Amino acid sequence: MKLATYKDGSRDGQLIVVSRDLSSAHYASGIATRMQQVLDDWNFLSPQLEELSQTLNHGKARHAFAFDARMCMAPLPRAYQWADGSAFINHVELVRKARGAEVPESFYTDPLMYQGGSDDFLGPCDDIVDRKSVV
């Protein structure tokens, strides 16, 4: 099952189900309108979304439309927080070397995680706007 958030003029977008081959999609508004709703009530909503996904993938969804990735927002445009893990040792070694710092021995056995508060996230095809140049 593929879920996405489509631009609809709101800050949170509209939840859609996308076909396996990324050719078509269907609004999930009869089930949930926002991705956060799905995460908050996964056990109840995911089976319904899975059923819609199967219907879409079998070409039987009545109101399917052509999927356009440029219309996608970030899956969760406004998340409560985010977490990031540095799991790629090669990347960490290169970054540390560029800064002239050693990789701590504990990094090879203890995962490095950090979190931050969220503002908003950009979609995969959205422009990054330099706020200093906006008048």
Give each language-model segment a name:
Residues 1-8, 12, 17-21, 36-135:
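Active-site microenvironments in enzyme catalytic cores
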Residues 25-29, 79:
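Conserved "landmark" site that anchors the functional core of diverse proteins
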